[in-house]
């Protein structure tokens, strides 16, 4: 999920975020980041499903045209 980020890099990112935002804001930021990622994944899945449906409909139309000829 994080690509080539290892544990030391993640700890450094967390430490910098802790210094910048403080311990009281960090849970709120994490929650909001989690919601954003969830929404992005949901949107991405919906787009993929829509494209798959559109592709199937196009294939069905092409099949009907071939059968009519």
From Swiss-Prot:
The chain crosses the membrane at residues 1-21. The keyword Methyltransferase does not apply. It is a single-pass membrane protein. Its main location: membrane. GO terms for biological process: protein transport by the Tat complex. GO terms for cellular component: TAT protein transport complex. Keywords: Cell membrane, Membrane, Protein transport, Translocation, Transmembrane, Transmembrane helix, Transport. One of its GO terms (molecular function) is protein transmembrane transporter activity. InterPro entries: TatA/B/E, TatA/E. It is found in: Cell membrane. Disulfide bonds: none annotated. Gene3D superfamilies: 1.20.5.3310. Part of the twin-arginine translocation (Tat) system that transports large folded proteins containing a characteristic twin-arginine motif in their signal peptide across membranes. TatA could form the protein-conducting channel of the Tat system. Forms a complex with TatC. Belongs to the TatA/E family. This is Sec-independent protein translocase protein TatA. It comes from Alkaliphilus metalliredigens (strain QYMF). The gene is tatA.
